[in-house]
Amino acid sequence: MDEIKTLLVDFFPQAKHFGIILIKAVIVFCIGFYFSFFLRNKTMKLLSKKDEILANFVAQVTFILILIITTIIALSTLGVQTTSIITVLGTVGIAVALALKDYLSSIAGGIILIILHPFKKGDIIEISGLEGKVEALNFFNTSLRLHDGRLAVLPNRSVANSNIINSNNTACRRIEWVCGVGYGSDIELVHKTIKDVIDTMEKIDKNMPTFIGITDFGSSSLNFTIRVWAKIEDGIFNVRSELIERIKNALDANHIEIPFNKLDIAIKNQDSSK
């Protein structure tokens, strides 16, 4: 009985002391957690005016770093030796780095993209044959909305090591199209017909150089290559479609043949008596 009383006498002060320490640690963690959210949102608000890609990436890094520091301080408040924590984290970090080297290289790739700044949110870019609008640069990956509506998520390490074509660095973009006409066509008439179509299209930038000329002798057609420039804001695909449609109608109106493959089938009658 005396032993139980002794245990209870020792337990309650210790429990009270540990409870106070635990409450302090929880308060420290809650404050740090709230502060990390506050600083992340503040960073997003300040930097998004300049560049949303930069703002999103820096905000994520800031949030994670403050959360790690807060966790270490909270554990230190509980009496855990921070030097031991750092040592363990270092050892675990090496093991994790070896196991997740691709993810770490993606983080490094994201930092490189932030420093070099080859694109920003909303830019139309082409990476490894994929073209679309940049939606976000995250901690590990870059989100690209393709023209058909699909979302491509590319690792930052791949993006940083790939050739990036940014179509938003210029107000105009060149449209190239090959049009085949019959070998018997009047070349000057074909040239004039196509030029008249281009001259009447308001969406074609007349200040940029235009090219219309024969570039190849096809198997069944003279191939004219047409190069014009259109404003990005007008929609390159829409302008190209309208240009092709107008040229087709103009060639038909001038009775200029557009060759196409034909298949002739010859049926030979055989004498059934043989």
Swiss-Prot record:
Keywords: Cell inner membrane, Cell membrane, Ion channel, Ion transport, Membrane, Transmembrane, Transmembrane helix, Transport. It comes from the Bacteria. Residues 45-56, 101-274 are cytoplasmic. GO terms for cellular component: plasma membrane. Residues 1-21, 78-79 are periplasmic. The chain crosses the membrane at residues 22-44, 57-77, 80-100. It is found in: Cell inner membrane. Gene3D superfamilies: 1.10.287.1260, 2.30.30.60, 3.30.70.100. It holds the Pfam family MS_channel_3rd. It is a multi-pass membrane protein. GO terms for molecular function: mechanosensitive monoatomic ion channel activity. Signal peptide: none annotated. InterPro entries: LSM_dom_sf, MS_channel_1st, MS_channel_C, MscS_archaea/bacteria_type, MscS_beta-dom_sf, MscS_channel_2nd, MscS_channel_C_sf, MscS_channel_TM-2. Homoheptamer. Mechanosensitive channel that participates in the regulation of osmotic pressure changes within the cell, opening in response to stretch forces in the membrane lipid bilayer, without the need for other proteins. Contributes to normal resistance to hypoosmotic shock. Forms an ion channel of 1.0 nanosiemens conductance with a slight preference for anions. Belongs to the MscS (TC 1.A.23) family. This is Small-conductance mechanosensitive channel.
